[in-house]
């Protein structure tokens, strides 16, 4: 990979990993509501699911030409529906002001999110088909870059969770407003899938 292509790869992957999306918003919300330690299950579920999805993207990227457009469209609708459901859960979740201690979303729920998270699917397919496959079609490289993509995505999730933890006091003071803003950002993510 040339230095120019490598810099484009890093720019694309880091910007995509650090911008708002379902995982980052969920990580921020969970750490704000429950603290970083209690959010580690959420982050672990995301990370494992992310890795598996990136490996699946590697396989998909190899056979991109034969993907049924109807299946991709169906996946987009399923992803949008799940993201809207997640937005509803965040918008209606109790805050500390409400005097309730809701538990964070489970490992398995955050794991399952990855399989309908269109942002990471597109992230994986785009990175692999744009930066890797034109350079090499060696399976070891494709798998290696898939693992790297999952690590970069996990880094973004942890950064957002740490921000939620570090600004917890401020976010708790304005918990209801924050939850509504985060929910609206998720709805925006769902809408952006189609437009």
UniProtKB/Swiss-Prot annotation:
It catalyses: O-acetyl-L-serine(in) = O-acetyl-L-serine(out); L-cysteine(in) = L-cysteine(out). The chain crosses the membrane at residues 10-32, 47-67, 70-90, 105-125, 142-162, 177-194. GO terms for molecular function: amino acid transmembrane transporter activity. NCBIfam families: PRK10323.1. It comes from the Bacteria. Residues 33-46, 91-104, 163-176 are cytoplasmic. GO terms for cellular component: plasma membrane. GO terms for biological process: cysteine export across plasma membrane. It is found in: Cell inner membrane. It comes from Shigella flexneri. This is Cysteine/O-acetylserine efflux protein. It is a multi-pass membrane protein. Keywords: Amino-acid transport, Cell inner membrane, Cell membrane, Membrane, Transmembrane, Transmembrane helix, Transport. Residues 1-9, 68-69, 126-141, 195 are periplasmic. The keyword Membrane applies. The gene is eamB. Belongs to the Rht family. Exporter of O-acetylserine (OAS) and cysteine. InterPro entries: LeuE-type (IPR001123). The keyword Transmembrane helix applies.
């Amino acid at each position: 990979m040339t230095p120019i292509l490598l810099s484009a790869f890093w720019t694309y992957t880091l910007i995509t990993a650090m911008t708002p999306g379902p995982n980052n918003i969920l990580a921020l919300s969970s750490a704000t509501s429950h603290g970083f330690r209690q959010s580690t299950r959420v982050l672990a579920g995301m990370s494992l699911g992310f890795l598996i999805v990136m490996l699946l993207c590697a396989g998909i990227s190899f056979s991109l030409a034969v993907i049924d457009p109807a299946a991709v469209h169906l996946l987009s609708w399923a992803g949008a529906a799940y993201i809207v459901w997640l937005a509803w859960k965040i918008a209606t979740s109790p805050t500390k002001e409400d005097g309730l201690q809701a538990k964070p979303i489970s490992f398995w729920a955050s794991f399952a999110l990855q399989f309908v998270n269109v942002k990471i699917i597109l992230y994986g397919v785009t990175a692999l088909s744009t930066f890797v496959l034109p350079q090499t079609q060696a399976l070891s490289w494709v798998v290696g870059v898939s693992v790297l993509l999952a690590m970069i995505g996990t880094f973004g999730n942890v950064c957002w969770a740490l921000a939620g933890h570090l600004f917890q006091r401020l976010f708790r003071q304005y918990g209801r407003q924050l939850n509504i803003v985060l929910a609206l950002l998720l709805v925006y993510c769902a809408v952006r899938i189609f437009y």
